[in-house]
């Protein structure tokens, strides 16, 4: 099973993004078991420092993980790949991961040290900074693209 875990709220995402994200999730499910879990955003964060906020979000992220999960952080400091390389990466993971493969998008300040320690890998979708809702959409689109590449679908063109 592939899982995308997100720190944040559905309330902060526009309907147009939700529609597009759900469309790619449904398309991707033709090829593999895929689920998206939203970890609730923290309340009353204005009084919290960035480090405290990362720690609290990190506790919620770690609580959502299961023993044996292979954890991949979507992080600006992670490895960058072209779409073809990501498809090959997914193929390797699907052939070797016995439990869940969990991709995590962090909160506005990134991840806590404990979440970095729990991670097996880091991937970057771009060196640019994107909004949380954009990253959700970009990731699910790239996951769908990877599945069509692996299955010979007409979606991807080189």
Predicted feature residues:
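Single conserved hydrophobic/aromatic residue that forms the stacking wall/gate
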Residues: 1-13
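S-adenosyl-L-methionine/SAH cofactor-binding core of RNA-modifying enzymes
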Residues: 33-99
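Structured adenosyl-cofactor binding patch, chiefly the S-adenosyl-L-methionine
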Residues: 113-157
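A short, Lys/Arg-enriched amphipathic alpha-helix followed by its capping loop at the start of a domain
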Residues: 20-31
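Glycine- and acidic-residue-enriched helix-capping/strand-helix junction motifs
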Residues: 14-19
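Rossmann-fold NAD(P)-binding glycine/threonine-rich loop
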Residues: 106
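Short, structured coil segments at secondary-structure junctions
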Residues: 7-8, 32, 118-119
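Conserved acidic residues
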Residues: 10, 69, 120
